[in-house]
């Protein structure tokens, strides 16, 4: 018996130590640069802590003051490449910096031939290196790049930097077009980033969408692969995605892509001037969604040359997406002519609705009612969002949790109309400066169980809001968080996509990112 007790005690001690060791491994913090190298998807608390706090995309860095190895004061102007410049913050004592320099050094001639110059900026840390040590390290490894020194760390601190290596991709004028904290892991990753720098963020994503989601008839499939489940799913097409692609095409002036997307909508989704909310093969949904039709209407108006289509679709929306008292409603049924008895707040795209006002007598009264309904949906300044929908029959607002993609669309429409509440903007700014935005909250502003994750789409919409209100810092924060989900790998079929794998790709993320990128190009940020 005593022997058995000793065996049991020994086993208990063994498993206790094993559990303690596992706990230590789980809780052990990873080195900064090692965490920086992980990509593309991360938890909210990890996703941006290493991104420079004060950087603004489009910001000119050329005038910042540095020191040459000879002790002379300089700015970046003498070091800019003909077309593009990679400014990499590094330190000779930093192992991850050394790996990145070793990746770039053999590519020096290739980069130079492409008009790309590499400049090393030494984060001089007297406790870890000296000027002589830095010179010796570069000489010993025969590093062919120019280098300068942020000797008092003034620029490092001004930009709110956190780690090295951090690489700034500058255009020919010295403006930041892309920032990548952490190690560039491969030539394929660098190639994708250089393509981004040369052609803009949209190019790689549009290429991915064309290759993997855009079918032969111009429909944007929900996913890359067929699902085999109930419709809609897999390679079915949502009116939502068609409208977003048309929005992107209108913003970029791409008439051929616009025509292709619209032709699909007219052929496979159109039901008497309204769009079925999805198409699955030769079948389509039996109801429309007001927001989908408004998005297409707005894109037709923005593209120009579709006057008759704008008028006919505006009249159809006014006729079918209002009840007998003139209230705007979510959907109209093609099968039995019935209508929804509610209005979802994110369906109130005021810019699109204003297109209808002068075309349909009395439509202004419907807008006034909808504005009153939306104002009543406001949850308060502590959590400055809006209830999901209003039920006309019960005269009550939904008290369910908020899908933040839909909640953000409501704020976007408010911002586009010039009615975004200061409390809403302040909430966005605080969250984006902090741990980010989760996928789902209750009406009190608490994250709901299962909703503690982020999505590229939500951050894309935050970026669109930032564009509307002219907040460059918020825009940069939104883009950088969105791009933490983006694949940068020129040799990967996933390059340019916002997903971890082809199985995880959804059209909503890709299309919203394209719309955001299009707006950034038009603002020349």
Functional labels for PLM-detected ranges:
Residues 98-140, 153-157:
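Structural microenvironment flanking redox-active thiols in thiol-disulfide oxidoreductases
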Residues 173-203:
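Thiol-/selenol-based redox modules, centered on thioredoxin-like
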Residues 361, 407, 413-420, 468, ...:
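Terminal, non-catalytic domain-edge segments
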Residues 135-173:
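Short, internal strand/loop/helix patches
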Residues 9, 39-77:
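N-terminal "domain-start" segment that seeds a small globular fold
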Residues 76-98:
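Short active-site neighborhood of thiol/selenol oxidoreductases, capturing the structured segment around
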Residues 205-291, 428, 458, 465-468:
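N-terminal carbohydrate-binding/catalytic regions of secreted carbohydrate-active enzymes
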